[in-house]
């Protein structure tokens, strides 16, 4: 398992967790609390993620664990990671970038989850749909709450663009990053709500 940190100017430092063939986790850039790291952090990191019985659910629980287990690795060591990190950095610099071709780890997912995933990945750059519309697109017209739950648990933000799914009367939610972050992502794509 490879963990690569990447810097996104004006956004912070994010992380990509990759198993060599597919994305396992993506942590959106957040401001860096440690001033010694700075906003120009270099891609680095190799670590191990311990799978749960149901598969890999998330990286280790604490950043100190992640940092302690890292050895220095450049993104170029894994071409798929280098490409994905480059596209993420382009996206955060304002370029129109799509991620529909990025392979993700959906092992153990239900048919419903796979259908919602496929429908969400078809939402284009600069487009938004409501939770209800996404439920219809996925073939589950009465499952808007379940779709909202799927969005809330999305471990592949941007690659699976949950930020493009909004409530019928506003932005909806965006987990621990909050509505300002979601609004900022949408504004980057030319969407104002």
Regions from the PLM with identified roles:
Residues 120, 134, 162-163, 185:
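Residue-level signal for inorganic ion chemistry
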Residues 115-119, 146, 184:
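Pre-recognition alpha-helix immediately N-terminal to the DNA-recognition helix
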Residues 169-193:
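…primarily DNA-binding HTH/wHTH and HhH modules…
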Residues 1-141, 192-193:
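Basic nucleic-acid-binding alpha-helical/helix-turn surface characteristic of O6-alkylguanine DNA
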Residues 156-167:
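Local cysteine-cluster metal-coordination motifs and their immediate loop/turn environment
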Residues 142-157:
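Regulatory, non-catalytic segments
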